[in-house]
Amino acid sequence: MLRSTHPPPSSPSSSSSGGGGGGGSSASSSSEKTMVGGGGGGGGGSGSAAPSGAKLLQILNVRVVGSGERVVVLSHGFGTDQSAWSRVLPYLTRDHRVVLYDLVCAGSVNPDHFDFRRYDNLDAYVDDLLAILDALRIPRCAFVGHSVSAMIGILASIRRPDLFAKLVLIGASPRFLNDSDYHGGFELEEIQQVFDAMGANYSAWATGYAPLAVGADVPAAVQEFSRTLFNMRPDISLHVCQTVFKTDLRGVLGMVRAPCVVVQTTRDVSVPASVAAYLKAHLGGRTTVEFLQTEGHLPHLSAPSLLAQVLRRALARY
């Protein structure tokens, strides 16, 4: 998901200032077990309950565009917001109703709505997704998730299999950290250095990370990703990264029943190609892998027409 070109500071800094605290900048060697049964429920730091469905539609800037009977949900990844889909959206709206929303951590969402305790694991993000679908009275959809949203979609489909006809997982990983018998792409010590760099100087880290993540030589894509990355409040960005890197979904992949399409670029700094093979072998639903002939973690920004062809092909068959 992230790497930094900047070395860690000589003396580690505490996590960035800002409301609620990021929960410290240390990574745990034992991954958090995400609850498949649900319930990020209420209470975070303020003890407030999760917003109602109607209120959530407003908070997360939910939009429904396009026409057609079939519904597609587009869910963006870390460091972006729903605008990341703008280049592929025209390829989908002619034949589908498309639901777009912002994750609560996105810079386009009022940061007062980010409850550090509630969003300390992915279950609360799953709650938000399911609440949106219920509020819109959507009985069935195809879900397209990028990076962390691929994880969210996997968990949501396990909790509510009736809702999800297909999952399209872009730059997906069930676990970003390496293990004794698994190559996720990152060592624990490496991630700790990234957390330290984010906490010490978020601007410097983001400036170095954006071109690495985009990968391909597409300056406009780097500029766009930089914009949304800088829109995130630094302490929220760090907290989200810590949450993602302590998550391990390998044990629940077999519970997925929806057919899946895993979309992988030829070189992704965040997700090795071996992870796509792992997902194909372990997801419970019928799974195919589509390799895009481009580099980078954000093909919807760097190669939108190429990704759109894969999406149209995948979404024509559900």
Swiss-Prot record:
Catalytic class of the enzyme: hydrolase
GO molecular function: hydrolase activity
Amino-acid positions noted as binding substrate in the UniProt annotation, renumbered to this chain: 147, 241, 297
Keyword vocabulary terms for this entry: Cytoplasm, Hydrolase, Nucleus
Tissue expression remark: Expressed in the parenchyma cells of the root stele and lateral roots, vascular tissues of vein and leaf sheath, ligule base, auricle base and stem base.
Phenotypic consequence of residue 205 to A: Decreased enzymatic activity toward strigolactone and loss of strigolactone-dependent interaction with SLR1
Subcellular localization(s) per the UniProt record: Cytoplasm; Nucleus
GO terms classed as biological process: secondary shoot formation; strigolactone biosynthetic process
Gene Ontology CC: cytoplasm; nucleus
The keyword Heme is assigned to this record: no
Annotated spans, Disordered: 1-48
Active site (record annotation): 147 (nucleophile), 268, 297
PANTHER family xref list: ESTERASE-RELATED
Family per similarity comment: Belongs to the AB hydrolase superfamily.
Record function comment: Involved in strigolactone (SL) signaling pathway. May function downstream of SL synthesis, as a component of hormone signaling or as an enzyme that participates in the conversion of SL to the bioactive form. Strigolactones are hormones that inhibit tillering and shoot branching through the MAX-dependent pathway, contribute to the regulation of shoot architectural response to phosphate-limiting conditions and function as rhizosphere signal that stimulates hyphal branching of arbuscular mycorrhizal fungi and trigger seed germination of root parasitic weeds.
Subunit structure: Interacts with D53. The interaction between D53 and D14 is enhanced in the presence of strigolactones. The interaction with D53 occurs in the presence of (2'R) stereoisomers of strigolactones, but not (2'S) stereoisomers. Interacts with SLR1 in a strigolactone-dependent manner. Interacts with D3 in a strigolactone-dependent manner.
Official protein name in the record: Strigolactone esterase D14
Organism: Oryza sativa subsp. japonica
